Amino acid sequence: MKKSFIVFCSLFLILSQGFSFEWGGLLNNNSTGVYEVKNSLNEDADFSFNQKNGLYLWLSNPLSEKGNWKLNSEIAYIANVKPNDEPVFQNIIDLTLLKFSGQLAFKKSSVDVSLGRFVVSDKTGNIFSTTSDGAYLKFNSSIVGLSGYVGYTGLTNLLNSTEIEGYDNEDAVQFYKFQYPLIPLIFSFELPSLFANQNLTFQVLASLNCGNNVNMGNKYFATLALDGPIYSKLFYLLQTTFGTKEFKGIMNYSSVDFMWYPLSFVNINLGVKYASGKEDLNGFFVPFSGVTLVQKSPLDENYLSDCLLPTASIVFYNGPFHSKLEVKCDIDIVDAENNLFTVRGYYGSLDTTLNIFSDLQIGFDMNLLVDSVSSQDFMFNATIKAAFAF
């Protein structure tokens, strides 16, 4: 592990050579207390504590006089104390970012280029979103946008990135654990301002299994999205995704979101997500599962699946203060044909942040989860956050 740390530091120093560069860092703290009650299982109330501290060093190195080509990098050291029968201490060292990027500009178009390690996400943000090593190209014009990405996840650090679906993290592992190896392929076709400032996007995604777990399989997805203004302060986003694993059955993920900005410091969001389950349309759809565990059902350890998830949130932002209140209702789909549903539970969260100075931020988050199937079960957690930039 000492060798890994030396390699990361050496990379950081090498990248500092060349044109004038900028560098900085961040120290953060997250202290979380969790209170959980499971009366339905005749278990005593349980309290646990999680402590997470991180040190991040970043560097931006221009590679051209105009600054349109640059090399960005970031290394991190993270210390976790996870609750268990006995507390689990975990140390993580990671190269979180190593990205060469730039733009080729033409008269009426441009081409964006990115190579290296960086976070990649699909259009929905709920199917594939994790750190990956790869190459990204995008052609931009006022009429059409075309982009493509090819990457490899097997060299990134699982301990500090979004888990691959079906591939478990291990608390006992220290410093570095290779993520499950997949080759993500993403291609997007965009028509900006198709009509009345409405935007249309079509995206295909393939996740190719390169590991020895045959149950992972290859997954393929196609997404269609339409977004734009309804009027000056009201916007919408419609998305639907059809996917398949090894071409055995079809799964669907769809969402509708409305964003309203009544005041300059307030926005209100209403939406609903749908993820297919085995009983939908008499078994026409199979349970939905993405590639990475981005968004889980609040009442289920598995990926968001077999449910409707109505969501409402309101966001306040005024100068250094930012606050978000969100409520979700998790509805289990029992028989979509007969419109029979079961409410599994409710989830509420309040997230607040305050920038005391330009380099000092504090925050406080609260989350409450109520299991409506067993109304005596609930979970509450609160997190105190602090971050100092230098």
PLM segments and residue spans:
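Surface-exposed beta-loop-beta
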Residues: 199-257
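Active-site beta-loop-alpha junctions enriched in small/polar residues
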Residues: 76-78, 151-153, 205-209, 241-243, ...
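Extracellular/periplasmic loop regions
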Residues: 237-326, 338
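Beta-barrel outer-membrane channel/assembly domains of diderm bacteria
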Residues: 17-114, 135-142, 214, 218, ...
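Sec-dependent N-terminal signal peptides
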Residues: 4-15
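Secondary-structure boundary elements
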Residues: 139-145, 191-197, 228-235, 244, ...
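Surface-exposed coil loops of outer-membrane beta-barrel proteins
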Residues: 34-40, 82-95, 103-215, 220, ...
